[in-house]
Amino acid sequence: QNHMGIIFITHNLGVVAEVCDKVSVMYAGKMVEQGPVDDIFYNPGHPYTKGLLRSMPRVDAESYERLIPIEGTPVDMLNPPEGCPFAPRCEHAMKICLQKMPPYVAMGENHRAACWLRVQDCLEEAKKGNTETANIEKTEVDSHE
């Protein structure tokens, strides 16, 4: 619109929703999800993104609703894990999550997430013959630091 861009680094997702068109969600220096702001907010593909959204106050929530924290402790950046950096805190972590970074999986036009759960979803779709929804990018997350 204005032929300019701004890199806005924040945990304030309310401001992100108001200011941004595109969002890159990072955890421990790795981009784990990227896409249009509405896709990220209404169809998050990475467990960290989902955790961020669950942990923020909502205007439409009842006043007695408690925020849901992301369990665990942040990754030790001096000794990062081999696999997905969020795996030790992820309630859905599988063995492969601890061993290897996942590839990006397309979740829609210009929306992708780096999560082995999404890869499993894509593999299931491919087995069913739904190749349109089984879109796994060959680029590894490590190259997108």
Describe each PLM feature range:
Residues K138-E145:
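Long, low-complexity, intrinsically disordered segments
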Residues Q1-E65:
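P-loop NTP-binding/switch modules centered on Walker-like glycine-rich loops
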Residues V37-E132:
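Charged, flexible cofactor/metal-binding loops and thiol motifs
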